[in-house]
Amino acid sequence: MLTETEGRAAVKLARKTIEIFLSKGKSPRPDASGVELSPVFEEYRGVFVTLTEGGLLRGCIGHPYPDSTLKEAILDSAISAATRDPRFPTVEQDEMKNILVEVTILTQPEKINASPKELPDKVEIGKHGLIVKQGYCQGLLLPQVAPENDMDSIDFLSHTCMKAGLSPDAWVKGAEVYCFEGQIFKEKEPDGEVIEEKF
């Protein structure tokens, strides 16, 4: 778990990384952001960076698995959310004054070993994020997606399947389901106070 101070640093690092990248056109080094980073940023963690503008999603990309240090994962995810999310055009530099930055630190995903009938009861809304895998298809939804969209566990499972490009009932038909938890830090206003969001 990150402290509030570390959570603020994670969000500031994501914002500064995007701002530097958009102004200079290249990825900054983590220490170029001017954000003081504690030793936790050297640990290997999964992370997602989410950008919203006017209450609407503007970009969301991350590392589901702990495949790099937290600081490197934040740098990569921040730049990708702003410039490589295929659902949206690249963020413009002057847009950043209207964009809220959110960073979700993930636990290691764990497979849910349960029958399809038992599966919905294993999913805790507001606590769990989900990954659904089948063949070459994989989809992920963060823990905050379900409560923010008034989903129950069946809705959440179905939407994660659709995110993977599968039918909504793939979780009933043998797709593998993994859960993880997320610690969410977000700006209350653009480049403003950072809070930890809990559901």
UniProtKB/Swiss-Prot annotation:
InterPro entries: AMMECR1, AMMECR1_dom_sf, AMMECR1_domain, AMMECR1_N, AmmeMemoSam_A, Uncharacterised_MJ0810
Domain of life: Archaea
Gene3D superfamilies hit by this protein: Hypothetical protein ph0010, domain 1 (3.30.700.20), Hypothetical protein ph0010, domain 2 (3.30.1490.150)
Transmembrane segment boundaries: none
Pfam families recorded: AMMECR1 (PF01871)
Span of domain AMMECR1: 5-196
Descriptive protein name: Protein MM_0484
Organism: Methanosarcina mazei (strain ATCC BAA-159 / DSM 3647 / Goe1 / Go1 / JCM 11833 / OCM 88)
